[in-house]
């Protein structure tokens, strides 16, 4: 799948601890190598009430993604207590 990054995702990534950042890098690589969301062996859940928005769980952090066809847009990465205030 094609992977894109929002400016807010890159900005959020600077504030994430190093060990979580390493796990996120592996997740991004796995997304690039997969053909669909179903191929990913990640903790992905659809955001209720939104058609194309999902979250990926990484420890106490959540990655907010948008899926359009074969493109994944990484929108936000925030702590679990604040992700749903800013995403989607």
UniProtKB/Swiss-Prot annotation:
Changing residue 62 to K/S: Inactivates toxin. This is Toxin RelE3. GO terms for molecular function: nuclease activity. It comes from Methanocaldococcus jannaschii (strain ATCC 43067 / DSM 2661 / JAL-1 / JCM 10045 / NBRC 100440) (Methanococcus jannaschii). The keyword Translocase does not apply. Its EC number is 3.1.-.-. Toxic component of a type II toxin-antitoxin (TA) system. Has RNase activity. Is very toxic upon expression in E.coli. Its toxic activity is probably neutralized by the cognate antitoxin RelB3. InterPro entries: RelE/ParE_toxin (IPR007712), RelE/ParE_toxin_dom_sf (IPR035093), TA_system_RelE_toxin (IPR052747). Keywords: Hydrolase, Nuclease, Toxin-antitoxin system. Forms heterodimers with RelB3 and possibly a heterotetramer RelE3-RelB3(2)-RelE3 from 2 heterodimers. The heterotetramer is probably not very stable in solution. Transmembrane segments: none annotated. It comes from the Archaea. The keyword Hydrolase applies. It is an enzyme of class 3 (hydrolase). Gene3D superfamilies: RelE-like. Belongs to the RelE toxin family. PANTHER family: PTHR38813, TOXIN RELE1-RELATED.
